[in-house]
Amino acid sequence: MRAAWFALTSVIAVAGCAHTPSASNAWTTGPTFAPMAAATATGAFAATLDGSTTKAAPYTIRVHITKGGKILPHTHPDPRVITVVDGNLCYGFGEAFDPEACTMYPEGSYFLVPGNVPHYGYGKEDAVYQESGVGPSAFVLVPTK
């Protein structure tokens, strides 16, 4: 009897979690990447997977940084969660771009970048990562000293 009750409540719990995708998050073959602005990055490409950084709502961006690519030091007003999807991500914190001081995050890594904290990326090798946050957001380049 106890096993039957567990099975029934499990089915009800799973059924209650069912979700029908809306048109905005329906299955696609993959994101379309565009080069990041030349003033902020070289060898880096970004695609918006869901939402928009300009709206007061959740968003997810996927970034591909190529070997030798750079994303210059910058901040965002909102905290962001980073997930490394492919490769090893070289990610650093601070106002000066220093590829020797960055930390290598292997595929599967997950970490938080607090809002208004300067950070940068470097392509010691190709890597793909995702950034998720809640907008509105901005990309604020740290002035070169």
Can you say where each PLM-predicted feature lies in the sequence?
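Double-stranded beta-helix
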Residues: 100, 120-145
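C-terminal motif of bacterial Sec signal peptides marking the signal peptidase cleavage site
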Residues: 14-16
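Bacterial N-terminal signal peptides that target proteins for export
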Residues: 1-7
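A short, N-terminal "cap"/entry segment at the start of jelly-roll beta-barrel domains
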Residues: 18-59, 102, 144-145
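Extracytoplasmic
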Residues: 44, 56-60, 79, 116, ...
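Short acidic-glycine-tyrosine-enriched beta hairpin
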Residues: 68, 89, 95-116
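Conserved short histidine dyad/triad with adjacent acidic residue
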Residues: 56-76, 104-105
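Glycine- and acidic-residue-biased ligand/ion/polar-headgroup-sensing regions
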Residues: 66-69, 75-96
